[in-house]
Amino acid sequence: MKKIILITMLISALFAQSDCNKKNWQEYYNSDGRDMSDCQLQGAMLRGARLMGADLTGADLTGANFTQSRLMGADLIGANFTGANFTGAKLVGIISGDIRGVPDNLPEGWSLVDGTLIK
């Protein structure tokens, strides 16, 4: 019985450490499918990051800084943009919809209309 409890605790600890966040997001981006879905990136400093084709569905981007980042082809459906900064970010070919919150800044010519990014 003690072995089962110990194994359960170890497995739980491994899964708890594997949540995508602002400290380990690179591991998730570099994985198959660039899966950063539901990633917790609140306040993350991603200035100039190259996130082409990233799956950011449902990610919490609250207060994150994406200034001059490259998000071409990224999937942003259901992400939380509250207070995020996307000044100068490259958003060509993104997939968006059901975006929550209002970002502080978007790239020139872009707007958020009914949860969808439009240029």
Model-derived features: positions:
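Tandem repeat scaffolds
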Residues: 17-119
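Sec-dependent N-terminal signal peptides
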Residues: 4-13
